[in-house]
Amino acid sequence: MLKPLGDRIVIELIQTEEKTASGIVLPDTAKEKPQEGKVVAVGSGRVLDNGERVAPEVSVGDRIIFSKYAGTEVKYDGKEYLILRESDILAVIG
């Protein structure tokens, strides 16, 4: 399993089927980048200047919304993941 370092978070992208207002399903090439994902691994947290470690605010299993062009896409064990910094997370859903 991927183990993120520091304030990094590993997420699995949640793909949504995109349709136009008239019901046409858009091909992958015309879709927006997904901005929603499920947290699958969390780093140990960010280290402050005084050496204190701040625990991440998200947990494994959380559904999140993140910045549109954030993170680095990686493939591991046949699945696609995104590794991003905690600061790229905009909200936790639910």
From Swiss-Prot:
InterPro entries: Chaperonin_GroES (IPR020818), Chaperonin_GroES_sf (IPR037124), Chaprnonin_Cpn10_CS (IPR018369), GroES-like_sf (IPR011032)
Stretches that traverse the bilayer: none
Domain of life: Bacteria
Gene3D superfamilies assigned: GroES chaperonin (2.30.33.40)
Subcellular location(s) per record: Cytoplasm
GO terms (BP aspect): chaperone cofactor-dependent protein refolding
UniProt keyword list: Chaperone, Cytoplasm
Record-level Gene Ontology MF annotations: ATP binding; metal ion binding; protein folding chaperone; protein-folding chaperone binding; unfolded protein binding
Pfam families registered for this protein in UniProt: Cpn10
Cellular component terms (Gene Ontology): cytoplasm
Family: Belongs to the GroES chaperonin family.
Oligomer and partners: Heptamer of 7 subunits arranged in a ring. Interacts with the chaperonin GroEL.
PANTHER family: 10 KDA HEAT SHOCK PROTEIN, CO-CHAPERONIN GROES
NCBIfam families assigned: PRK00364.1-2 (NF001527), PRK00364.1-6 (NF001530), PRK00364.2-2 (NF001531), PRK00364.2-3 (NF001532), PRK00364.2-4 (NF001533), PRK00364.2-5 (NF001534)
Function: Together with the chaperonin GroEL, plays an essential role in assisting protein folding. The GroEL-GroES system forms a nano-cage that allows encapsulation of the non-native substrate proteins and provides a physical environment optimized to promote and accelerate protein folding. GroES binds to the apical surface of the GroEL ring, thereby capping the opening of the GroEL channel.
Protein name: Co-chaperonin GroES
Gene that specifies this protein: groES
